[in-house]
């Protein structure tokens, strides 16, 4: 599923991401925009052989099991394919674990590059939340 910006903001809010670990909703919507372009089916292969999955590009080396990444830790106890469904609840649950892991949203390269230190409120502007 490809979400619209405001549709995703509403879903993320419903699942409790607004101000989770102190990160406003705009941060999460911005991260999703630059990680997956709001597409739940996005995948990207990494040079280490792992793959990133779903709207927040969650990595198979650490967080989910795709059956092909050697030595996966699967810290979210989930199959990577479950992170690619139209319902973002599994991705949100795993993202909450990731953001609580010590590095906050710095775990997402796209967030560091494009969202960190910017006015992220624009990402939820004009959304009926």
Curated annotation (Swiss-Prot):
UniProt-annotated location(s): Secreted
One BP term from GO: defense response to Gram-negative bacterium
Catalysed reactions, as listed in the record: Hydrolysis of (1->4)-beta-linkages between N-acetylmuramic acid and N-acetyl-D-glucosamine residues in a peptidoglycan and between N-acetyl-D-glucosamine residues in chitodextrins
Molecular-function GO terms, alphabetical: lysozyme activity
Disulfide bonds: 6-127, 30-115, 64-80, 76-94
C-type lysozyme domain boundaries: 1-129
Source domain of life: Eukaryota
EC number from the UniProt entry: 3.2.1.17
Function: Lysozymes have primarily a bacteriolytic function; those in tissues and body fluids are associated with the monocyte-macrophage system and enhance the activity of immunoagents.
Recorded family membership: Belongs to the glycosyl hydrolase 22 family.
Subunit structure: Monomer.
Protein name (Swiss-Prot/TrEMBL): Lysozyme C
Organism, as annotated: Crax fasciolata (Bare-faced curassow)
Gene transcribed to yield this protein: LYZ
């Amino acid at each position: 599923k490809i979400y619209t910006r405001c549709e995703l903001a509403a879903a993320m809010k419903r699942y409790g991401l607004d101000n989770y670990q102190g990160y406003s909703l705009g941060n999460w919507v911005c991260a999703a925009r630059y990680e997956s372009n709001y597409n739940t089916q996005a995948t990207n292969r990494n040079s280490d052989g792992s793959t990133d999955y779903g709207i927040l590009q969650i990595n198979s080396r650490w967080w989910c099991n795709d059956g092909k990444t050697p030595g996966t830790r699967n810290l979210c106890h989930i199959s990577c394919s479950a992170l690619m469904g139209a319902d973002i609840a599994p991705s949100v649950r795993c993202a909450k674990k990731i953001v609580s892991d010590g590095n906050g949203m710095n775990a997402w390269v796209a967030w560091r590059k494009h969202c960190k230190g910017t006015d992220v409120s624009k990402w939820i502007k004009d959304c009926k939340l």
